């Protein structure tokens, strides 16, 4: 008998589809099939069957296989004594590895996903049935970019996009059909910072961006940027100023923040304006991002037509001047630990006067030391 390439055969248990690229001199040597398998006609290794019957006959690229009365198998009319139709090196798993979350749902272990798309499809369906039977709620499925071919399979099973990062896409599935989904939505905001760096000569550190909208070409503006993941607002402001201008600074306080909507890809934006004390004055620009940077007299800065006509920025300047003359007090970070999660976090607030600990009061602190 001619050898049979297992790349021509699709075997399904539940809805598992296995395609192999190896040929054997003896047909299906070292391979077995369970009577629980139900089989389908295929048109190559990528064929997928959605059949749910339990017929014991299937067709491969060069012929057909049928169950015999003695629980053996027959191919093209020839009895196969071997009852093996799956490589012993490939041990089938029926469910995806997952662990429970705090809210009655499950999180799939993305480090243990099967590499075979057919196996993934079968295990995903079986897992959904198992989780539904156990009364689970939401399912979180993180698919690394290296296994992006699994994304359309999950989408076909009813998963939805939640968010994506550089190395993965996160999908979700809400199991209870009679209940609205309680899974939290993707992050709705981006967080930016601007560094208002003022020296003792009342000069403000400003930059001209290398790439900007034509309407603001030539505008001198504050160094700005986005907060990185797990980065504090105050450290992000110091970092952005250093990266763009080379000037070292010390965080003083958040003097104001702006909340705007539909800023980028329909996301909202939180922009924190931070007053920073300069610790150096030498400017070394980031040539990839910044066209120019300099120390500019505050009076000259606010007289720029675009700045002068901007009511919001005019108010920011007024707040900064009020802070310098002790008529205003911004928000300073205080590290505290909450019993809810046991983790330290930054709570921003101001203290006008603390008789027990004068150093605790940020409002009485001179901006220039």
From Swiss-Prot:
Taxonomic superkingdom: Eukaryota
One of the Pfam families matching this protein, by short name: NUDIX
Protease found in the keyword field: no
UniProt KW Metal-binding keyword: yes
Binding site for Mg(2+): 240, 244
Tissue expression remark: Expressed in roots, stems and, at lower level, leaves.
Cellular component GO terms, alphabetical: cytosol
Single GO biological process annotation from the record: response to wounding
Family annotation (PANTHER family): FI03680P, NUDIX HYDROLASE RELATED
Function: Probably mediates the hydrolysis of some nucleoside diphosphate derivatives. May be involved in plant immunity and act as a positive regulator of defense response through salicylic acid (SA) signaling.
The protein's name in its UniProt record: Nudix hydrolase 8
């Amino acid at each position: 008998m001619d050898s049979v390439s297992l790349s021509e055969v699709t075997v399904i248990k539940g809805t598992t589809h296995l395609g192999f690229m190896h040929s054997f001199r003896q047909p299906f040597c070292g391979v077995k099939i369970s009577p629980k398998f139900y089989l389908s006609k295929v048109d190559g290794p990528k064929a997928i069957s959605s059949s749910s019957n339990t017929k014991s006959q299937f067709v491969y690229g060069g012929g057909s296989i049928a169950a015999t009365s003695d629980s053996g198998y027959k191919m093209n009319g020839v009895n196969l004594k071997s009852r093996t139709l799956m490589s012993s090196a490939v041990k089938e798993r029926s469910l995806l590895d997952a662990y429970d979350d705090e809210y009655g749902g499950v999180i799939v272990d993305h480090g243990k996903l099967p590499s075979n798309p057919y196996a993934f499809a079968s295990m995903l369906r079986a897992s959904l049935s198992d989780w539904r039977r156990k009364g689970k709620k939401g399912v979180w499925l993180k698919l690394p970019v290296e296994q992006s071919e699994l994304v359309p399979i999950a989408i076909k099973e009813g998963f939805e996009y939640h968010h994506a990062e550089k190395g993965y896409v996160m999908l979700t599935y809400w199991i209870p059909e009679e209940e609205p989904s309680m899974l939290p939505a993707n992050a709705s905001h981006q967080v930016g910072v601007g560094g208002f760096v003022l020296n003792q000569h009342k000069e403000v550190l400003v930059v001209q961006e290398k790439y900007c909208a034509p309407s603001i070409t030539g505008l001198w503006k504050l160094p700005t940027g986005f907060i990185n993941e797990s980065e504090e607002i105050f450290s992000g402001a110091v970092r952005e100023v250093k990266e763009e201008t080379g000037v070292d600074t010390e965080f003083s306080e958040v003097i104001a923040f702006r909340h705007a909507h539909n800023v980028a890809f329909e996301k909202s934006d939180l922009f924190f304006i931070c007053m920073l004390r300069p610790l150096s004055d030498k400017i070394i620009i980031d040539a990839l991002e910044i066209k120019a940077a300099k120390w500019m007299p505050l009076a000259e800065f606010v007289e720029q037509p675009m700045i002068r006509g901007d009511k919001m920025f005019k108010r920011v300047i007024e707040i900064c001047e009020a802070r310098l003359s002790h008529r205003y007090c911004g928000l300073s970070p205080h590290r505290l630990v909450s019993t809810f999660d046991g983790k330290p976090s930054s709570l921003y607030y101001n203290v006008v006067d603390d008789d027990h600990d004068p150093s605790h009061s940020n409002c009485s602190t001179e901006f220039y030391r």
